[in-house]
């Protein structure tokens, strides 16, 4: 193992010595991420979790999966998988949601599309949901911000907190989870505040009913029925998608292919490669993954084709 600059990245091509001083690596990691714990007991527990995660990444390096993507000791290295999932993977799929059947035979046959690198669009910086299960709000706002620029040539920085605090009547539950279509419904009925007027706090709050909500461009939403339709939709706009993000905890780079279709996280599809790999905008900050993004193997990987949708703008 070696430290590459400021990154605690485990190089796939390097043999990991059994003589590594895990305690020193842990100390470097804590310094990088400014971690301090409230008690010696908590410190010992977090070191144990860190060590377990280090061993998991070592084992991954020896597997065949490491040929297509890499892992690292990132900001989640002191969290167990259960803690990570309960904190960050809080998508609430409605019982009434119609999920598309998986299409194992889908193959993308188009050209590359990448809305993160398009001269017609001022691509917004990747945001960080923090320790709040508000992925659904960031997915909806991400699609709204980018698509409003693409389709209407208007630029906004919109408020996820407005959705967290105020869309409860639409069956969303703030930091305990929600659904992108429900967020689009809320915005269609009420408009949406700008971030400067309703800033993000990463916690549930009381709805600010008196705040101005100047964003009134949503007329509804469209649910996408298949991988084929998703591939067509990304040609013209970004798309909110639901995925299984359990295997994403330590993702660093490359094309991830192994996951289930248990939908637990809301993100934004922002591109597709010529080989069919999907490019995803996440909400865990720009230091996670590929500048805040992840690439998934083509087809219905991680359930990406199960429930895509996008807002209808006007």
Swiss-Prot record:
Keyword Signal among record annotations: yes
Signal sequence segment: 1-24
EC class name: hydrolase
Keywords: Disulfide bond, Hydrolase, Protease, Secreted, Signal, Thiol protease, Zymogen
Residues at the catalytic site: 135, 265, 282
Gene3D superfamilies for the chain: Cysteine proteinases (3.90.70.10)
Source organism, top-level taxon: Eukaryota
Alphabetized SMART domains for the sequence: Inhibitor_I29, Pept_C1
Family note: Belongs to the peptidase C1 family.
Function: May be involved in extracellular digestion.
Name of the protein: Cathepsin L 2
